[in-house]
Amino acid sequence: LNGNCIRLGVSGAGKSFSVKQEIAYVLLSTHDDVLVLDPEGEFTPMIGAFGGSMIDISGSSAVRINALDMEKGYADDGKDPLPDKSEFVLSLFEQIMQDDLKAQHRSIIDRCVQAVYRPYIASGYKGDAPTLTNLQAEIKRQPEPEAQELALAAELFISGSLSIFAQKTNVDQNNRLTSYNILDLGEQLLPMGMLVILESIYNRVIQNWRAGRRTWVFVDEFSIFFRYPFATNFFLRMWKQVRKRDGYMTGITQNVGEMLTSKDACWMLANSEFLIMLSQSASDRAALAELLNISDT
């Protein structure tokens, strides 16, 4: 059985309350780990009550999370992990460059991802993983003018004032209950931050899987991942991979209308075996009924 879950409902319908109930049950009745991506800071009191770690991430905090951290076992069945990691990095540059990310840029990014990771993989994942700072340096070494466009566009997020994901991770993420609070991350960093933290969570899932430990992942406001193609592909891949690594993933959102405009989001909804629908707006209710083939009676 696919244990992944989607919870939908308008603001105030009880989504957060139902998730908190489930988290409490998991913590009190199992030895599993629970990881929460919390864009609104809604889970902070509960995390504190259960002795969990609250990692507060903002442009002004001292917390650093390396966007390019990668655990052994990142890809399926011993396959080359770089195609998947390259897609993740492309999703980051998609946030940075928006509609200006062209085919030439994508080729350069893929080439440079291969270059900075090969030594790390060849070493058996020993030592420090590369960082976005290393990647930017590799991009600058490329001869194409498009490479310089990439390096300049990414400067704010790599060597500028919003560089919190461009350096080595400096925070302990090993508490059984860990929440990533990104309430104060700011508009510019929020989409990129959600991607990086979700990637960090995925690396933790891999660690736990290799240690024989189950992980529950709760992602609030996950509809944001369906705004951009590469981010969508990354989220869908993680949605599939987490359950293969003894994890359960829950997506939570009130933006049902936004999800229903995405073909991939509709596919997720139509193929989820565990779907919780709380109070919906009239238009969303009708659209969900049509998508899921729910009759009026």
Stretch-by-stretch model annotation:
Residues 71, 291-296:
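Conserved AAA+ ATPase "sensor/coupling" helix adjacent to the nucleotide-binding pocket
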Residues 1-59:
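Glycine-rich phosphate-binding loop of nucleotide-binding enzymes
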Residues 282-292:
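Conserved beta-strand-loop-alpha-helix hinge in the C-terminal portion
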Residues 1, 41-53, 57-61, 66-247, ...:
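P-loop NTPase motor domains
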Residues 253-254:
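H-loop/switch region of ABC-family ATPase nucleotide-binding domains
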Residues 34, 216, 250:
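Hydrophobic "anchor" residues on beta-strands that sit immediately upstream
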Residues 51-55, 263-278:
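A short helix-turn-beta junction within AAA+ P-loop NTPase domains corresponding to the substrate/partner-engaging
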